[in-house]
Swiss-Prot record:
Family annotation (Pfam families): YceG (PF02618)
Subunit description: Interacts with RodZ. Interacts with MreC in the elongasome; interaction is strongly reduced when the 90 C-terminal residues of MreC are missing. Interacts with KhpB (also called EloR/Jag) via MltG's N-terminus, suggesting the N-terminus of MltG is cytoplasmic.
Residues exposed to the Extracellular side: 209-551
GO biological process, one term: cell wall organization
Membrane topology: Single-pass membrane protein
InterPro entries: MLTG-like
Family listed: Belongs to the transglycosylase MltG family.
Subcellular location: Cell membrane
Known function: Functions as a peptidoglycan terminase that cleaves nascent peptidoglycan strands endolytically to terminate their elongation.
Protein's recorded name: Endolytic murein transglycosylase
Length: 551
Protein backbone atom coordinates (compact mmCIF):
# COMPACT_ATOMS: atom_id res chain seq x y z
CA UNK A 1 0.00 0.00 0.00
CA UNK A 2 1.37 3.47 -0.94
CA UNK A 3 1.92 6.28 1.58
CA UNK A 4 -0.80 8.35 -0.04
CA UNK A 5 -3.31 5.58 0.52
CA UNK A 6 -2.30 5.34 4.17
CA UNK A 7 -2.87 9.08 4.63
CA UNK A 8 -6.30 8.84 3.03
CA UNK A 9 -7.16 5.97 5.35
CA UNK A 10 -6.20 8.04 8.42
CA UNK A 11 -8.21 11.06 7.33
CA UNK A 12 -11.15 8.85 6.59
CA UNK A 13 -10.96 7.30 10.04
CA UNK A 14 -10.79 10.76 11.57
CA UNK A 15 -13.87 11.85 9.77
CA UNK A 16 -15.67 8.76 11.05
CA UNK A 17 -14.72 9.59 14.66
CA UNK A 18 -15.98 13.14 14.24
CA UNK A 19 -19.26 11.87 12.94
CA UNK A 20 -19.54 9.59 15.96
CA UNK A 21 -19.02 12.57 18.25
CA UNK A 22 -21.73 14.48 16.46
CA UNK A 23 -23.95 11.52 17.04
CA UNK A 24 -23.20 11.69 20.77
CA UNK A 25 -24.30 15.32 20.77
CA UNK A 26 -27.55 14.29 19.17
CA UNK A 27 -28.13 11.71 21.83
CA UNK A 28 -27.49 14.40 24.51
CA UNK A 29 -30.25 16.55 23.12
CA UNK A 30 -32.64 13.59 23.07
CA UNK A 31 -31.89 12.83 26.73
CA UNK A 32 -32.55 16.43 27.74
CA UNK A 33 -36.02 16.17 26.24
CA UNK A 34 -36.63 12.96 28.20
CA UNK A 35 -35.55 14.42 31.58
CA UNK A 36 -39.10 15.52 32.21
CA UNK A 37 -40.19 11.91 32.21
CA UNK A 38 -37.18 10.13 33.65
CA UNK A 39 -35.15 11.61 36.47
CA UNK A 40 -31.76 10.34 37.29
CA UNK A 41 -30.46 10.09 40.87
CA UNK A 42 -27.91 12.51 42.29
CA UNK A 43 -25.09 10.21 41.73
CA UNK A 44 -25.76 10.01 37.89
CA UNK A 45 -22.59 10.49 35.87
CA UNK A 46 -22.18 13.89 34.29
CA UNK A 47 -21.76 14.56 30.60
CA UNK A 48 -18.07 15.10 31.08
CA UNK A 49 -17.73 11.68 32.67
CA UNK A 50 -19.62 10.05 29.84
CA UNK A 51 -17.41 11.86 27.35
CA UNK A 52 -14.39 10.58 29.19
CA UNK A 53 -15.81 7.07 29.03
CA UNK A 54 -16.36 7.45 25.30
CA UNK A 55 -12.82 8.62 24.75
CA UNK A 56 -11.57 5.72 26.82
CA UNK A 57 -13.59 3.36 24.67
CA UNK A 58 -12.23 4.94 21.49
CA UNK A 59 -8.69 4.63 22.82
CA UNK A 60 -9.35 0.99 23.59
CA UNK A 61 -10.61 0.46 20.03
CA UNK A 62 -7.60 2.25 18.58
CA UNK A 63 -5.22 0.17 20.64
CA UNK A 64 -6.80 -2.98 19.26
CA UNK A 65 -6.91 -1.66 15.71
CA UNK A 66 -3.88 -2.40 13.52
CA UNK A 67 -1.40 0.40 13.09
CA UNK A 68 -0.34 1.63 9.68
CA UNK A 69 3.28 2.61 9.36
CA UNK A 70 3.84 6.17 8.14
CA UNK A 71 6.42 7.58 5.92
CA UNK A 72 9.21 9.32 7.86
CA UNK A 73 8.88 12.46 5.76
CA UNK A 74 5.32 13.09 6.79
CA UNK A 75 4.40 14.53 10.14
CA UNK A 76 1.63 12.10 10.94
CA UNK A 77 0.82 11.44 14.65
CA UNK A 78 1.97 8.11 15.99
CA UNK A 79 -1.55 7.00 16.78
CA UNK A 80 -5.02 8.03 15.67
CA UNK A 81 -6.10 8.40 19.29
CA UNK A 82 -3.50 11.13 19.99
CA UNK A 83 -4.52 12.98 16.84
CA UNK A 84 -8.15 12.91 17.88
CA UNK A 85 -7.37 14.12 21.44
CA UNK A 86 -5.40 17.11 20.12
CA UNK A 87 -7.89 18.18 17.44
CA UNK A 88 -11.21 17.27 19.03
CA UNK A 89 -12.64 19.69 21.70
CA UNK A 90 -14.20 18.24 24.79
CA UNK A 91 -17.79 17.27 24.23
CA UNK A 92 -19.94 16.09 27.07
CA UNK A 93 -21.03 12.55 26.51
CA UNK A 94 -24.63 11.51 26.74
CA UNK A 95 -25.61 8.73 29.06
CA UNK A 96 -27.19 6.90 26.15
CA UNK A 97 -23.95 6.67 24.21
CA UNK A 98 -23.84 3.21 22.74
CA UNK A 99 -20.07 2.95 22.61
CA UNK A 100 -18.95 0.71 25.48
CA UNK A 101 -16.09 1.74 27.73
CA UNK A 102 -13.20 -0.39 28.65
CA UNK A 103 -13.87 -3.11 31.21
CA UNK A 104 -11.60 -1.43 33.80
CA UNK A 105 -13.25 1.95 33.61
CA UNK A 106 -16.70 0.42 33.46
CA UNK A 107 -16.14 -1.46 36.71
CA UNK A 108 -14.50 1.42 38.60
CA UNK A 109 -16.53 4.45 37.65
CA UNK A 110 -20.09 3.13 37.57
CA UNK A 111 -22.14 3.21 40.76
CA UNK A 112 -24.39 0.42 41.97
CA UNK A 113 -27.86 -0.22 40.78
CA UNK A 114 -29.96 2.86 40.36
CA UNK A 115 -33.11 3.96 38.62
CA UNK A 116 -33.94 2.49 35.21
CA UNK A 117 -32.04 4.23 32.47
CA UNK A 118 -32.65 4.12 28.72
CA UNK A 119 -31.39 0.91 27.25
CA UNK A 120 -28.11 1.30 25.46
CA UNK A 121 -27.82 0.13 21.87
CA UNK A 122 -25.56 -2.83 21.64
CA UNK A 123 -22.82 -2.76 19.03
CA UNK A 124 -20.52 -5.44 17.86
CA UNK A 125 -16.93 -4.54 17.19
CA UNK A 126 -14.53 -6.51 15.01
CA UNK A 127 -11.71 -7.46 17.33
CA UNK A 128 -9.92 -9.43 14.64
CA UNK A 129 -6.84 -7.55 13.41
CA UNK A 130 -7.16 -6.38 9.79
CA UNK A 131 -5.09 -4.36 7.45
CA UNK A 132 -7.91 -1.95 6.59
CA UNK A 133 -9.47 0.72 8.77
CA UNK A 134 -12.94 0.16 10.25
CA UNK A 135 -15.68 2.53 9.16
CA UNK A 136 -19.10 3.12 10.71
CA UNK A 137 -22.34 3.97 9.05
CA UNK A 138 -23.53 7.39 10.25
CA UNK A 139 -27.05 8.34 11.19
CA UNK A 140 -27.42 10.50 8.10
CA UNK A 141 -26.47 7.58 5.93
CA UNK A 142 -28.91 5.27 7.73
CA UNK A 143 -31.70 7.73 7.20
CA UNK A 144 -31.00 7.86 3.47
CA UNK A 145 -31.40 4.10 3.10
CA UNK A 146 -35.08 3.37 2.43
CA UNK A 147 -34.84 -0.30 1.52
CA UNK A 148 -33.21 -3.24 3.19
CA UNK A 149 -29.86 -2.56 4.79
CA UNK A 150 -26.98 -3.50 2.50
CA UNK A 151 -23.40 -4.05 3.50
CA UNK A 152 -21.19 -0.95 3.14
CA UNK A 153 -17.59 -1.24 1.99
CA UNK A 154 -15.16 -1.01 4.91
CA UNK A 155 -12.74 1.39 3.24
CA UNK A 156 -12.05 3.02 -0.06
CA UNK A 157 -9.18 0.61 -0.44
CA UNK A 158 -11.67 -2.26 -0.62
CA UNK A 159 -13.56 -0.41 -3.39
CA UNK A 160 -10.35 0.07 -5.27
CA UNK A 161 -9.52 -3.59 -4.88
CA UNK A 162 -12.98 -4.56 -6.08
CA UNK A 163 -12.79 -2.16 -9.01
CA UNK A 164 -9.39 -3.54 -9.86
CA UNK A 165 -10.77 -7.08 -9.65
CA UNK A 166 -13.65 -6.18 -11.96
CA UNK A 167 -11.30 -4.52 -14.45
CA UNK A 168 -9.00 -7.49 -14.38
CA UNK A 169 -11.93 -9.82 -15.04
CA UNK A 170 -13.12 -7.63 -17.87
CA UNK A 171 -9.64 -7.36 -19.29
CA UNK A 172 -9.15 -11.09 -18.84
CA UNK A 173 -12.33 -11.78 -20.81
CA UNK A 174 -11.19 -9.77 -23.85
CA UNK A 175 -8.87 -12.47 -25.23
CA UNK A 176 -11.93 -14.81 -25.51
CA UNK A 177 -13.21 -12.88 -28.54
CA UNK A 178 -10.92 -14.63 -31.02
CA UNK A 179 -12.24 -17.99 -29.73
CA UNK A 180 -15.80 -16.94 -30.46
CA UNK A 181 -14.78 -15.76 -33.90
CA UNK A 182 -12.94 -19.03 -34.46
CA UNK A 183 -15.97 -21.04 -33.35
CA UNK A 184 -18.22 -19.03 -35.66
CA UNK A 185 -15.85 -19.73 -38.57
CA UNK A 186 -15.86 -23.46 -37.78
CA UNK A 187 -19.65 -23.45 -37.49
CA UNK A 188 -20.00 -21.68 -40.83
CA UNK A 189 -17.61 -24.15 -42.44
CA UNK A 190 -19.51 -27.16 -41.07
CA UNK A 191 -22.84 -25.73 -42.25
CA UNK A 192 -21.42 -24.98 -45.68
CA UNK A 193 -19.96 -28.46 -45.92
CA UNK A 194 -23.26 -30.07 -44.92
CA UNK A 195 -25.11 -27.96 -47.49
CA UNK A 196 -22.56 -29.03 -50.09
CA UNK A 197 -23.08 -32.69 -49.20
CA UNK A 198 -26.86 -32.25 -49.36
CA UNK A 199 -26.63 -30.63 -52.78
CA UNK A 200 -24.23 -33.32 -53.94
CA UNK A 201 -26.57 -36.07 -52.73
CA UNK A 202 -29.57 -34.41 -54.34
CA UNK A 203 -27.64 -33.99 -57.56
CA UNK A 204 -26.61 -37.64 -57.51
CA UNK A 205 -30.16 -38.78 -56.87
CA UNK A 206 -31.67 -36.66 -59.64
CA UNK A 207 -28.84 -37.63 -61.95
CA UNK A 208 -29.51 -41.30 -61.31
CA UNK A 209 -33.22 -40.80 -61.97
CA UNK A 210 -32.37 -38.89 -65.14
CA UNK A 211 -30.27 -41.80 -66.45
CA UNK A 212 -32.99 -44.32 -65.63
CA UNK A 213 -35.56 -42.16 -67.38
CA UNK A 214 -33.31 -41.98 -70.43
CA UNK A 215 -33.33 -45.79 -70.68
CA UNK A 216 -37.12 -45.97 -70.83
CA UNK A 217 -39.14 -45.90 -74.08
CA UNK A 218 -39.68 -42.53 -75.71
CA UNK A 219 -43.39 -43.29 -76.08
CA UNK A 220 -44.60 -46.51 -74.47
CA UNK A 221 -47.96 -46.31 -76.30
CA UNK A 222 -46.57 -45.71 -79.77
CA UNK A 223 -47.25 -48.37 -82.42
CA UNK A 224 -45.52 -46.61 -85.28
CA UNK A 225 -42.28 -47.88 -86.75
CA UNK A 226 -39.20 -45.90 -87.65
CA UNK A 227 -36.84 -47.24 -90.31
CA UNK A 228 -33.20 -46.73 -89.35
CA UNK A 229 -30.09 -47.62 -91.30
CA UNK A 230 -26.92 -48.53 -89.39
CA UNK A 231 -23.86 -48.17 -91.67
CA UNK A 232 -21.24 -50.89 -91.76
CA UNK A 233 -18.42 -50.32 -89.26
CA UNK A 234 -20.40 -47.99 -86.98
CA UNK A 235 -19.27 -47.96 -83.35
CA UNK A 236 -21.63 -47.84 -80.41
CA UNK A 237 -21.32 -44.04 -80.05
CA UNK A 238 -22.26 -43.52 -83.70
CA UNK A 239 -25.18 -45.93 -83.37
CA UNK A 240 -26.39 -44.00 -80.31
CA UNK A 241 -26.21 -40.73 -82.24
CA UNK A 242 -28.18 -42.26 -85.14
CA UNK A 243 -30.89 -43.52 -82.80
CA UNK A 244 -31.09 -40.16 -81.03
CA UNK A 245 -31.58 -38.34 -84.34
CA UNK A 246 -34.31 -40.84 -85.27
CA UNK A 247 -36.12 -40.07 -82.00
CA UNK A 248 -35.71 -43.58 -80.62
CA UNK A 249 -33.55 -42.70 -77.59
CA UNK A 250 -33.34 -39.56 -75.50
CA UNK A 251 -29.56 -39.40 -75.31
CA UNK A 252 -27.17 -41.25 -77.57
CA UNK A 253 -24.35 -40.87 -75.05
CA UNK A 254 -26.32 -42.62 -72.31
CA UNK A 255 -27.28 -45.31 -74.86
CA UNK A 256 -23.62 -45.94 -75.68
CA UNK A 257 -22.61 -46.02 -72.00
CA UNK A 258 -25.39 -48.49 -71.24
CA UNK A 259 -24.41 -50.70 -74.19
CA UNK A 260 -20.81 -50.83 -72.94
CA UNK A 261 -21.92 -51.43 -69.36
CA UNK A 262 -24.12 -54.36 -70.48
CA UNK A 263 -21.38 -55.60 -72.82
CA UNK A 264 -23.43 -55.26 -76.03
CA UNK A 265 -20.51 -55.36 -78.44
CA UNK A 266 -21.97 -57.38 -81.33
CA UNK A 267 -24.36 -54.79 -82.79
CA UNK A 268 -24.86 -55.37 -86.51
CA UNK A 269 -25.30 -53.07 -89.46
CA UNK A 270 -28.33 -52.97 -91.75
CA UNK A 271 -31.80 -51.50 -91.97
CA UNK A 272 -34.10 -51.86 -88.97
CA UNK A 273 -37.74 -51.10 -88.33
CA UNK A 274 -37.80 -49.91 -84.73
CA UNK A 275 -40.49 -48.45 -82.50
CA UNK A 276 -40.51 -45.59 -80.01
CA UNK A 277 -42.20 -47.93 -77.55
CA UNK A 278 -38.98 -49.95 -77.32
CA UNK A 279 -36.68 -49.48 -74.33
CA UNK A 280 -32.92 -49.19 -74.63
CA UNK A 281 -32.64 -52.87 -73.75
CA UNK A 282 -35.13 -53.80 -76.50
CA UNK A 283 -33.28 -51.71 -79.07
CA UNK A 284 -29.96 -53.35 -78.25
CA UNK A 285 -31.43 -56.84 -78.55
CA UNK A 286 -32.96 -55.95 -81.91
CA UNK A 287 -29.66 -54.55 -83.17
CA UNK A 288 -27.99 -57.84 -82.26
CA UNK A 289 -30.24 -59.72 -84.70
CA UNK A 290 -28.97 -57.87 -87.74
CA UNK A 291 -30.82 -55.71 -90.23
CA UNK A 292 -31.75 -56.12 -93.88
CA UNK A 293 -29.70 -55.03 -96.86
CA UNK A 294 -32.57 -52.86 -98.07
CA UNK A 295 -35.28 -50.98 -96.19
CA UNK A 296 -38.31 -53.14 -95.49
CA UNK A 297 -41.84 -52.23 -94.62
CA UNK A 298 -42.41 -52.42 -90.87
CA UNK A 299 -44.13 -55.52 -89.52
CA UNK A 300 -47.15 -54.71 -87.36
CA UNK A 301 -48.05 -58.28 -86.41
CA UNK A 302 -47.32 -61.91 -87.19
CA UNK A 303 -49.78 -64.60 -88.25
CA UNK A 304 -48.95 -68.25 -87.58
CA UNK A 305 -50.98 -70.92 -89.41
CA UNK A 306 -50.43 -74.32 -87.76
CA UNK A 307 -50.01 -77.43 -89.91
CA UNK A 308 -53.28 -79.26 -90.58
CA UNK A 309 -55.51 -76.18 -90.12
CA UNK A 310 -58.67 -75.99 -92.20
CA UNK A 311 -59.73 -72.81 -94.00
CA UNK A 312 -62.29 -72.17 -91.26
CA UNK A 313 -59.57 -72.34 -88.64
CA UNK A 314 -57.26 -70.12 -90.70
CA UNK A 315 -60.04 -67.53 -91.05
CA UNK A 316 -60.58 -67.51 -87.28
CA UNK A 317 -56.85 -67.02 -86.69
CA UNK A 318 -56.75 -64.09 -89.12
CA UNK A 319 -59.72 -62.51 -87.33
CA UNK A 320 -57.73 -62.47 -84.09
CA UNK A 321 -55.09 -60.13 -85.50
CA UNK A 322 -54.89 -56.73 -83.84
CA UNK A 323 -53.19 -53.69 -85.25
CA UNK A 324 -53.54 -50.51 -87.23
CA UNK A 325 -53.90 -52.18 -90.63
CA UNK A 326 -54.75 -50.68 -93.98
CA UNK A 327 -58.06 -52.60 -93.97
CA UNK A 328 -59.96 -54.65 -91.45
CA UNK A 329 -58.68 -58.22 -91.29
CA UNK A 330 -61.69 -60.28 -90.20
CA UNK A 331 -62.64 -63.97 -90.45
CA UNK A 332 -65.73 -63.14 -92.51
CA UNK A 333 -63.72 -61.11 -94.98
CA UNK A 334 -61.20 -63.92 -95.29
CA UNK A 335 -63.81 -66.63 -96.02
CA UNK A 336 -65.55 -64.36 -98.48
CA UNK A 337 -62.34 -63.78 -100.40
CA UNK A 338 -61.33 -67.49 -100.70
CA UNK A 339 -64.74 -68.13 -102.29
CA UNK A 340 -64.56 -65.15 -104.61
CA UNK A 341 -64.47 -66.65 -108.14
CA UNK A 342 -62.87 -63.55 -109.60
CA UNK A 343 -60.06 -63.73 -107.09
CA UNK A 344 -59.70 -67.51 -107.72
CA UNK A 345 -59.45 -66.93 -111.46
CA UNK A 346 -56.72 -64.35 -110.91
CA UNK A 347 -54.88 -66.78 -108.63
CA UNK A 348 -55.08 -69.60 -111.19
CA UNK A 349 -53.58 -67.29 -113.77
CA UNK A 350 -50.83 -66.26 -111.36
CA UNK A 351 -49.94 -69.80 -110.14
CA UNK A 352 -50.83 -72.08 -113.08
CA UNK A 353 -48.84 -75.15 -112.01
CA UNK A 354 -50.11 -75.06 -108.46
CA UNK A 355 -53.75 -74.43 -109.36
CA UNK A 356 -53.93 -76.32 -112.64
CA UNK A 357 -55.94 -79.18 -111.04
CA UNK A 358 -57.88 -76.99 -108.62
CA UNK A 359 -61.37 -78.45 -107.95
CA UNK A 360 -63.99 -76.95 -110.16
CA UNK A 361 -66.91 -75.01 -108.84
CA UNK A 362 -69.45 -77.88 -109.05
CA UNK A 363 -67.08 -80.56 -107.71
CA UNK A 364 -68.72 -80.53 -104.33
CA UNK A 365 -65.63 -79.13 -102.64
CA UNK A 366 -66.52 -76.99 -99.64
CA UNK A 367 -63.74 -74.51 -100.43
CA UNK A 368 -61.91 -74.72 -103.72
CA UNK A 369 -58.74 -73.28 -102.17
CA UNK A 370 -58.85 -75.65 -99.18
CA UNK A 371 -55.41 -77.19 -98.67
CA UNK A 372 -53.64 -74.76 -101.02
CA UNK A 373 -52.68 -72.20 -98.38
CA UNK A 374 -49.31 -73.18 -96.96
CA UNK A 375 -49.15 -73.38 -93.16
CA UNK A 376 -46.41 -71.02 -91.93
CA UNK A 377 -45.77 -67.74 -90.07
CA UNK A 378 -46.53 -64.55 -92.00
CA UNK A 379 -45.62 -60.95 -91.32
CA UNK A 380 -48.56 -58.59 -91.23
CA UNK A 381 -47.63 -55.10 -92.37
CA UNK A 382 -49.49 -51.85 -92.51
CA UNK A 383 -50.27 -52.41 -96.18
CA UNK A 384 -51.45 -56.02 -95.67
CA UNK A 385 -54.95 -56.82 -96.94
CA UNK A 386 -57.02 -60.00 -97.01
CA UNK A 387 -56.27 -60.47 -100.69
CA UNK A 388 -52.55 -59.87 -100.29
CA UNK A 389 -52.46 -62.26 -97.33
CA UNK A 390 -54.16 -65.13 -99.25
CA UNK A 391 -51.91 -64.47 -102.21
CA UNK A 392 -48.85 -64.70 -99.94
CA UNK A 393 -50.04 -68.10 -98.65
CA UNK A 394 -50.61 -69.40 -102.18
CA UNK A 395 -47.16 -68.19 -103.16
CA UNK A 396 -45.63 -70.06 -100.20
CA UNK A 397 -47.32 -73.34 -101.27
CA UNK A 398 -46.23 -72.86 -104.86
CA UNK A 399 -42.67 -72.25 -103.73
CA UNK A 400 -42.53 -75.36 -101.51
CA UNK A 401 -44.07 -77.64 -104.17
CA UNK A 402 -41.96 -76.33 -107.00
CA UNK A 403 -39.27 -78.91 -106.16
CA UNK A 404 -41.78 -81.77 -106.46
CA UNK A 405 -43.85 -80.82 -109.49
CA UNK A 406 -41.94 -83.12 -111.79
CA UNK A 407 -42.07 -86.01 -109.29
CA UNK A 408 -45.78 -85.57 -108.79
CA UNK A 409 -46.31 -85.70 -112.53
CA UNK A 410 -44.11 -88.79 -112.84
CA UNK A 411 -46.35 -90.60 -110.33
CA UNK A 412 -49.35 -89.87 -112.52
CA UNK A 413 -50.75 -87.65 -109.82
CA UNK A 414 -52.12 -84.16 -109.98
CA UNK A 415 -51.25 -81.51 -107.42
CA UNK A 416 -54.84 -81.65 -106.18
CA UNK A 417 -54.63 -85.45 -105.72
CA UNK A 418 -51.30 -85.21 -103.92
CA UNK A 419 -52.56 -82.49 -101.57
CA UNK A 420 -55.75 -84.47 -100.91
CA UNK A 421 -53.77 -87.59 -99.88
CA UNK A 422 -51.33 -85.44 -97.88
CA UNK A 423 -54.22 -83.78 -95.98
CA UNK A 424 -55.36 -87.23 -94.77
CA UNK A 425 -51.80 -88.33 -93.94
CA UNK A 426 -51.35 -85.11 -91.90
CA UNK A 427 -54.16 -86.07 -89.52
CA UNK A 428 -53.83 -89.86 -89.48
CA UNK A 429 -50.18 -90.03 -88.48
CA UNK A 430 -47.91 -87.97 -86.26
CA UNK A 431 -44.51 -89.43 -87.07
CA UNK A 432 -42.82 -89.33 -90.46
CA UNK A 433 -42.34 -93.11 -90.43
CA UNK A 434 -46.04 -93.71 -89.84
CA UNK A 435 -47.00 -91.07 -92.37
CA UNK A 436 -45.06 -92.84 -95.10
CA UNK A 437 -46.63 -96.23 -94.19
CA UNK A 438 -50.14 -94.71 -94.09
CA UNK A 439 -49.56 -93.02 -97.47
CA UNK A 440 -48.54 -96.46 -98.83
CA UNK A 441 -51.78 -98.01 -97.51
CA UNK A 442 -53.83 -95.28 -99.24
CA UNK A 443 -52.03 -95.86 -102.54
CA UNK A 444 -52.56 -99.65 -102.22
CA UNK A 445 -56.30 -99.20 -101.62
CA UNK A 446 -56.60 -96.68 -104.45
CA UNK A 447 -54.82 -99.06 -106.78
CA UNK A 448 -57.26 -101.81 -105.79
CA UNK A 449 -60.34 -99.56 -106.03
CA UNK A 450 -60.97 -99.95 -102.35
CA UNK A 451 -62.57 -97.09 -100.42
CA UNK A 452 -60.06 -95.21 -98.26
CA UNK A 453 -62.31 -95.48 -95.15
CA UNK A 454 -60.66 -92.55 -93.36
CA UNK A 455 -62.49 -91.07 -90.39
CA UNK A 456 -60.72 -87.75 -91.09
CA UNK A 457 -62.78 -87.17 -94.23
CA UNK A 458 -66.04 -87.98 -92.39
CA UNK A 459 -65.19 -85.52 -89.58
CA UNK A 460 -64.52 -82.83 -92.18
CA UNK A 461 -67.88 -83.55 -93.81
CA UNK A 462 -69.50 -83.18 -90.38
CA UNK A 463 -67.67 -79.91 -89.75
CA UNK A 464 -65.87 -81.42 -86.74
CA UNK A 465 -62.36 -81.63 -88.09
CA UNK A 466 -60.03 -79.61 -85.95
CA UNK A 467 -62.18 -80.03 -82.88
CA UNK A 468 -61.28 -82.11 -79.85
CA UNK A 469 -62.83 -85.50 -80.63
CA UNK A 470 -62.81 -88.28 -78.06
CA UNK A 471 -62.05 -91.90 -78.92
CA UNK A 472 -65.72 -92.83 -78.45
CA UNK A 473 -66.85 -90.06 -80.83
CA UNK A 474 -64.29 -91.11 -83.39
CA UNK A 475 -65.51 -94.72 -83.31
CA UNK A 476 -69.16 -93.66 -83.50
CA UNK A 477 -68.85 -91.42 -86.59
CA UNK A 478 -71.62 -91.60 -89.16
CA UNK A 479 -70.12 -93.53 -92.04
CA UNK A 480 -73.40 -93.26 -93.93
CA UNK A 481 -73.34 -89.47 -94.21
CA UNK A 482 -74.35 -88.17 -97.61
CA UNK A 483 -71.27 -86.19 -98.61
CA UNK A 484 -68.66 -86.27 -101.36
CA UNK A 485 -66.20 -86.54 -98.45
CA UNK A 486 -67.68 -89.88 -97.30
CA UNK A 487 -64.78 -92.13 -98.32
CA UNK A 488 -66.44 -95.10 -96.62
CA UNK A 489 -69.06 -95.20 -99.34
CA UNK A 490 -67.30 -93.45 -102.20
CA UNK A 491 -64.34 -95.07 -103.91
CA UNK A 492 -61.39 -92.88 -104.67
CA UNK A 493 -60.36 -89.47 -103.32
CA UNK A 494 -62.48 -86.62 -102.02
CA UNK A 495 -63.03 -83.55 -104.25
CA UNK A 496 -60.08 -81.85 -102.61
CA UNK A 497 -57.93 -81.59 -99.51
CA UNK A 498 -59.55 -81.31 -96.06
CA UNK A 499 -56.76 -79.23 -94.45
CA UNK A 500 -53.46 -77.52 -95.20
CA UNK A 501 -50.85 -80.32 -95.01
CA UNK A 502 -47.35 -79.75 -93.76
CA UNK A 503 -44.31 -80.13 -95.96
CA UNK A 504 -43.51 -83.35 -94.07
CA UNK A 505 -46.91 -84.81 -94.92
CA UNK A 506 -46.47 -83.74 -98.54
CA UNK A 507 -43.04 -85.34 -98.79
CA UNK A 508 -44.31 -88.50 -97.05
CA UNK A 509 -47.12 -88.69 -99.60
CA UNK A 510 -44.67 -88.30 -102.47
CA UNK A 511 -42.13 -90.74 -101.06
CA UNK A 512 -44.44 -93.28 -99.42
CA UNK A 513 -43.25 -96.58 -97.93
CA UNK A 514 -44.27 -99.46 -100.13
CA UNK A 515 -45.89 -102.47 -98.44
CA UNK A 516 -48.77 -104.91 -98.83
CA UNK A 517 -50.70 -103.36 -95.97
CA UNK A 518 -54.30 -102.46 -96.68
CA UNK A 519 -55.41 -101.56 -93.16
CA UNK A 520 -54.22 -99.54 -90.18
CA UNK A 521 -55.64 -98.44 -86.84
CA UNK A 522 -54.13 -95.99 -84.36
CA UNK A 523 -54.12 -96.28 -80.58
CA UNK A 524 -54.60 -92.62 -79.75
CA UNK A 525 -53.80 -93.22 -76.08
CA UNK A 526 -50.33 -94.54 -76.93
CA UNK A 527 -49.78 -92.79 -80.25
CA UNK A 528 -49.00 -96.10 -81.91
CA UNK A 529 -50.30 -97.32 -85.29
CA UNK A 530 -51.03 -101.01 -86.01
CA UNK A 531 -51.03 -102.28 -89.62
CA UNK A 532 -52.61 -105.33 -91.30
CA UNK A 533 -52.88 -106.72 -94.81
CA UNK A 534 -56.21 -108.53 -94.23
CA UNK A 535 -59.54 -107.79 -92.61
CA UNK A 536 -59.21 -110.45 -89.89
CA UNK A 537 -55.97 -109.08 -88.49
CA UNK A 538 -57.32 -105.59 -88.74
CA UNK A 539 -60.47 -106.47 -86.76
CA UNK A 540 -58.29 -108.06 -84.07
CA UNK A 541 -56.16 -104.88 -83.86
CA UNK A 542 -59.29 -102.74 -83.55
CA UNK A 543 -60.73 -104.93 -80.80
CA UNK A 544 -57.47 -105.01 -78.86
CA UNK A 545 -56.20 -101.46 -79.24
CA UNK A 546 -59.39 -99.43 -79.64
CA UNK A 547 -62.56 -101.12 -78.42
CA UNK A 548 -60.90 -102.47 -75.26
CA UNK A 549 -60.22 -98.91 -74.16
CA UNK A 550 -63.76 -97.67 -74.62
CA UNK A 551 -64.93 -99.31 -71.35
Amino acid sequence: MSEKSREEEKLSFKEQILRDLEKVKGYDEVLKEDEAVVRTPANEPSAEELMADSLSTVEEIMRKAPTVPTHPSQGVPASPADEIQRETPGVPSHPSQDVPSSPAEESGSRPGPGPVRPKKLEREYNETPTRVAVSYTTAEKKAEQAGPETPTPATETVDIIRDTSRRSRREGAKPAKPKKEKKSHVKAFVISFLVFLALLSAGGYFGYQYVLDSLLPIDANSKKYVTVGIPEGSNVQEIGTTLEKAGLVKHGLIFSFYAKYKNYTDLKAGYYNLQKSMSTEDLLKELQKGGTDEPQEPVLATLTIPEGYTLDQIAQTVGQLQGDFKESLTAEAFLAKVQDETFISQAVAKYPTLLESLPVKDSGARYRLEGYLFPATYSIKESTTIESLIDEMLAAMDKNLSLYYSTIKSKNLTVNELLTIASLVEKEGAKTEDRKLIAGVFYNRLNRDMPLQSNIAILYAQGKLGQNISLAEDVAIDTNIDSPYNVYKNVGLMPGPVDSPSLDAIESSINQTKSDNLYFVADVTEGKVYYANNQEDHDRNVAEHVNSKLN
